[in-house]
Amino acid sequence: MIKVLVACANGAGTSLIMKMRVEKACKDLGVEVSTIHHCSLSEGKSAATQYDVVFCPLNFKNMFTDAEKKGVKICGMKNVLSDKEAQALLKEAGFAE
């Protein structure tokens, strides 16, 4: 089971939409999730190391380099509305086949 963090600038609209896409992608790929949390970038940056994977808009991916150095997979999404992109990123991160 993995712990997923989804972050956007304000932690409201975009991260909630991304959370729904990631939940659907995990379900479709059979990835078991223990926790999925959405939040603002500032909260996400400080909490990222407590998660296995972080999803954020691609232009904010560089904010999570410290967590990435500690083994957290960082998935930057180009299209936050895309189920297929969320699935592809989960596969690239090694959580699904």
Which role does the model predict for each range below?
Residues 68-70:
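Short, structured coil segments at secondary-structure junctions
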Residues 47-49:
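A short, aliphatic-rich alpha-helical micro-motif
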Residues 41, 58-62:
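Short, polar loop motifs at secondary-structure junctions
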Residues 52:
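Conserved acidic residues
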Residues 73-97:
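Ser/Thr/Gly-rich flexible loops in soluble cytosolic domains mediating phosphotransfer, phosphorylation
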Residues 2-41:
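Conserved active-site segments centered on acidic
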